[in-house]
Structures are given as structure tokens and as C-alpha cells.
Amino acid sequence: MGFLTKKERRVPDLSRYDYHYQNKPAVDSSKYYVPREYGGKRLSASAAAAAIYTNPNPNATGVSRSYSLMHSYNPAAARQPPAGRTYSLRSDRASSITSNSRRPAAGKAQVRRASTQQRRASVDQELGTGVNQPRTNSITVTTTKVRDPQGRTKSITKKTVRRINGYEVVETTTTTTTTEPLPTQNGKMPANMDLVSVEDGTDVEEEHDDGLPSPQAHFDEFSGDFVAEDDLSSEVLQHQQQQYIEDIVEEETEEEEDPGHTGTKRLPGEFNEPPRTNIAARRSNSLTGSLSSLGAKKTISEEVPLDQTSSVSKFSDAMEYIPPTTTTAKPKKSNLRNSMTARKLAQPQQGQNQRRTVSFTQGSIDHMNTTKKKKQPLTEQEMYLQALEVAKKKVYKTDDPAVVGNAANNSNKRVSTMGKRMTLRDSAPVPRSSSMMMNKFHDQGSARNNVAQQQTDVRRSKSMTGSAVPPQAGKKKLTDEEMYEKALEIAQKRYNDLVSADTAAVGAASVGAASAATPVASTAPKKSGFKQRFTKTFHTDDNKSKINNASAGGMVSGGAAAVEVAPGVTTTDPVVAENVNEASQIERMDNVEMASASAANEYAAPAAGFRATSAPLYQSRSAEPVGAYAAPDAPISKYKIVDKILKFAQSNYGYQAHDDEEAAMVAPASAPATAPAGTSMAQPVVVPVERRSSVGKHGNTTTLPVETPLADNASESSFRHTHPQEQPVPLSQIEKKISVVSETGSRKAAPAATAAKTPATAPAMSYGTAKTPFIDIDAVDALSGHVPFEEATRHASVATAATAATGGTTGTAATTGTGTSKKKSFLRKLFGRK
């Protein structure tokens, strides 16, 4: 059973050393291990062969390839039964290695087996063989890497063994990386290279007494190039190297072709070396001469270039001459292999040195030319001329005729200035101006460019005209006195212009006012401000008498209104005239209102203790009489919405007059107020305020004054509740005069009665068809001046209730009349009387 079979010990595969015994037929097989598969004499069969299914490494310098097709030495092995189904290294070839474990010494080389990969696949179906055939159809692939003591990979060997019907096809691919040992600084070869000199000029490798190569020689074989042993391969390699050198020489010849630098001098860091074509010959002669005598010493007296001794010292400038060195040779046999290697090393080094020297010389030519010139100091005159020329080019660009001429002459000479150092002595290249480029566009006939140029010219001309800046060349530096005088002159001029303009305006207005005989309709255009546009839609015209807005000064004959701004001063400015007319119109409206109020005061009987006066509520701003503008009863045809809202707000806000207006309103104490005939002075009746008790949430009892409900206290406007105001005077201390409208429409005054005192019977009151009281709010405001709208309405309701008690109207009718009067008085206050 296969599971109970004991697993044999695996033996390492030593086939990676097969290429070492290639082309060595004289080696005794008794001293070296020869695999039984190769018959002991076919050592070159596994040397170096290319793989069929794998591509060689393109970076490898040498690839050896050999193909071998060998018949099995034991044909009867194909008829043996299979030795288990485990795919391991237990093959006939591997088990035979156990009889002899001797291996050649590897010296100092550290050989490491990187990876071993075995792949065995049955090809019975492909070849049409039987199933019970032994495991002879298989493929084995082995990959081995060899590294040196420094850890660098020296070679990679891939061996593929294909067993088909008793035949073995061995394919071995060896990829080697040639690393030549670097020479020391004193020119000696490395210690591991045991080179000797003989009469024929060739050197051989050292052998031990027992006829076996030394471990060092064995290691050198791993380090060397295995392709060099083949004559055909060596010829191909030499041809490739020669072609590479010729390519380098051709490149260097093209780089050296510079007519401007043919006679350059040698740099300080450059060495005196012979022509480059003799480098290889001199190197071979020196190497042959040094090894010509057996055991003799020869001193190298020639001057050796630094680049040939060491590749590291090409950047070292410490020594320009290398001292002579001494070499010792040992009498040994010769070998063609090492001589070929030495000859091969000289040729690539020659091309490498040539390329390095040429690049160094080519890169330093410009630096030598620049350092060869010596700077000479400029005189003051030369420095001034150069500075002046540069300044002209910066300021005037190409406007200077001389510069333009030079640019025209040099336009066809396109000389490259890259890499040249600019000095003040050299003539600077003239840049192409914008005018030249625009001329070129004009010649091409581009319409778009022409339009762009015209727009640019127009903008430039506008900027030059608007700024009017004098040229900088004509400016002078002003002293402090001159600057002060100029500033004073400018200030005086501005002041005189302003004064003359004002005087001319006033004089023209005076002349126009004097020459105007009759007022003429104004035809001058008037500025339509925000007020005019806003109030035009609210003008009402009811075909009644209108107030003339024209000023007393009349109109100018030219068409502009002459408005009197101050006593004896008029103006024709439409804006000023408009403002003056508006102010005068508002003043006339106030006078008319005050006249109406004074008329109401004359008919009303003042209450006891009230400051009654026949003067208007507001003192007139003008000294002219009221009758000069309008009659007391003449209604106003035009009301401005702003004035209406302001007046309505003041009436509901409880407007308080200023001190001067208060003094004008108070009548002198010596002039007692008199009432018209047929009326009597009513005495004020003090009625205590009713109070009601309320219980708080903590059980305490509080007494609050019984006032009207909140619905009665609500104002028609929001001004009263949103702004602080003074408390109005109680109605119990004021005797109101309420004007009522009779059926005939005449105004009569009746004293207001209180709940405690029954007034005299009032005549029948009617407004329209319903017999309801009509409250004149203007009369109430004229009498009190600060009594709110709600208080007057409440007092009117009390008077209506008293009238109803005497037989006039019922309480229900009085209440209805009060609500109706509120709405009508609000509309009448907002849009004027009707």
C-alpha cells in the first residue's frame, strides 16, 4: 500500500554543477562525481542550453545553449512497475546519488539554492501509450541561483528534463551576469586573479599539484564569462564591441564639430594624454611588456592618464601625475582564455574613456570662453550713455527714431542670444514694439484687429484728453512758496466762482420779479419728486373754490416762477420755488383750519375753569390775515395724504403744544371769558368714580376703578397704544361744547350735560334722514386740544342719553348714532369734510 510505505530521505539535486565540467574531457571520472544518467563521459550534454518554453533574460550578457537527446542507459527500466504514486525526487537518477556524496569544493562562493520547482505531468493521452506504463513521460524543471559573497546574483540556471518513451531531452538555460573586477588605485589586478607571464605573452591559471584546479580558480570560473570559451561566440562579441565603439566615435565626432571652438585651449583640470586612437595599443603594449620577463620587475615610466587607472577617480583633481608602480610576475604556463579576456577588457574601456573625455571637454568650453574675458571698468561718460539709452527704451519704447531705425535694420537678422551674458558694453536686442505688430495686422487685412485697434485708440485718446497731464519732461520742482501761492490762487478762484454764481442767481431773480407785471402761467419743466408722484393720485377735485398756489411775487416773464425766499429776495429755481409753494400751501391750510376753529370758539360757550380764548389754536406762521387767502367756511379742495394722516395721528395721540404755543393759547387773566346771550355758564359736577372689587388668586380683595370696557377704550389708531402719552384731563372737569346739525343744516352749540344734571331741552337733531346726533370732532379738539377721540365720543353718548331721557330720542337710537358718528368722523378726518 502506498500509504504505509516509508518515505525515503530526499537528496539535494547537484545538477546545477554540470556546466562546470563542460568541455573538459581529460578529467578523470574517478576523482569527480559524474551522474550515471550522462554515462560518465558525456559531460558537455548538460552544459548550457536554452529553454523551449521560457524566454531568456534580455539583461543577461551571455546565454549558453545546448541541446542533447540521449537514449536511456537502461531500456529495461521502462518495463518496471511504478514505485508509488507520490511525485517526489525518488527517481532512479536521484537515488543513485546516494552512493557517492562527494562534491567538488566551491571555495569562498556562497551557493544557495533559491528555488526548486518540479513539474511532472502524464502525457499518456498525447502519446497514446498504455495506462499501466511506468512513470517515464514527465517534465522536470529546476531553477537555481548562484550568488557571490557580496550577495549579488552571479548566474541563474534553469534545467528542464523531459522524459518521453524512455528518452530524455535535457534543456539547460544558464543566464550569467558578467561582473569584471575593478582594478585597484595603484593599477594592480585583484588578488584573486593569479596571472603569470610567459614568453609567448599569455597567462594561465594556477593549478595544484594533484592536477585539480584550485578553489580560487574554481570560483573564477563562476565569475568569468562562459561564452568566451567558444571561438564563434567570442568573435561575435568582439564584432559587437567594435560596432559599439564605432557608434561612440561617430557620436563624438558629431558633438565635436563646432566651428566656433576649434582653437580652444586646454582646461587646467585636463590631462596631457596622447590621441585617443592609440589608447588601446599603448595599453596592450604596456601589459605585454610588464609580463615579458620571468620573475623580473619592470617599472612603468610612462605617464598614465587618470581616467585609465580608476573609474572612481575621474572626478578627483588632487593628483595630475601618478607615480610609477612596480609589478612582479611569476613563471607559469599560458592559457588562451585569460589572454582573450585581457584583450577584451581593453576595448570597451577605450570607448568609455573617449566618451567621458569628450563630454567633459564639450561641457566646459563655454565656461572657458566666459572666463577668458576680463572685465574693464567703464568710464563715467560710457556709463551715462548706457543708462540714458536704457532709460529711453523703457520710457519711449520704440518712439525714438534712432531706436526704430535700428529695429528695422535688425528685423531680418534673427540672432539667438541664449547662453550669452549681457553687459553694458553689448547692444541690447530691440524688442518688437506693439505698433509694429499692429502694422502687421493691418497688412493682413484683419477686420477684427482693426476694430480692436480703433477701440484702443479711442480709449487712449479719451484718457489723455480727460487727464490732461503735462509731460514729465516739462515738470519743474516747485518751491514751498510757489506751491503755497498756487494753492491760495486755486482756493480764491473757487470761492469767487461760488460767490459770483450765488449773486447772479439772486440778481436774476430780483430783476425777473421787478419786470413781471402780471402773473403768467409757468411753462418751465418741474422736477417730479417723490412727493409729487405720490400725491397726484390722492388729489380730489369737487369743483369748489381752490387756493391759488402762486406766490405773491408773481411770475417771471421768461416763464420761470419768481418765488420770494426772504423779504426782498426772490429766486427762479424750480426746485426752490416748489418747496416754497408747498410750505406756503401748508401754511394757508393751517390758517384755514385755525380760522374754522376760531369761528367755532366764537359760537361755543366756554366752561367754567377752562382756558377759553377766541384766538386760533395754533399761532399762524404768517403775519398775513386769514381772510386774504380763503374764507373761514370755504372747504379745502386738495388735501395731501401725508398731512391728513399726520393730523389724524396728532388728534388721536393727544398732541401737546409747545411752550410758546401754550402761551399763545392761554387768555389773559384780566379778560374773563364771556358767553353769548341766551347761554349760561354750567358749573362742573364732581362725580366719584365707581369701583368694583375683585378677588385675586391668593384670596386678597382689590378695588379697581370702574372704567369703560376695553372695547370702548380701544383706539381707532395704533398710535395711542404704541407710544407713551400724558393722561388726558378727566371729563368731569371739562364742559364740552358739542355742535349739532339741525334739519336746516345750521350749526348750533349746546352745553353738554352730565348724568347728575339734566340739561335744557335741545332742539331736534338730524343728520340726513336719521335723527342722530352729529359730533363735530374739530370743535372738540379746538376746545380741549388734548382730549382723546374716545373720551369725546363717550361724553357725546352721555349727552345723547340725557337728551333721550327728556323725550328727544330713545337710548337705542342714541347708541346707534354714536357708532355711526365714529365711522363718519374717522372718514371725514382722513379725507376731509363733505
UniProtKB/Swiss-Prot annotation:
Residue stretches of biased makeup (Polar residues): 343-368
Localisation: Cell membrane
Chain residue ranges for the region called Disordered: 75-136, 251-291, 343-378, 458-479
Recorded coiled-coil stretches: none
Top-level taxon: Eukaryota
Cellular component per GO, a single term: plasma membrane
Membrane topology listed for this record: Peripheral membrane protein
Any single GO BP term: meiotic cell cycle
Disulfide bonds: none
Functional description taken from the UniProt entry: May be involved in the control of meiotic sister-chromatid recombination.
Name used for this protein in its record: Meiotic sister-chromatid recombination protein 3
Organism: Candida glabrata (strain ATCC 2001 / BCRC 20586 / JCM 3761 / NBRC 0622 / NRRL Y-65 / CBS 138)
Gene that encodes the chain: MSC3
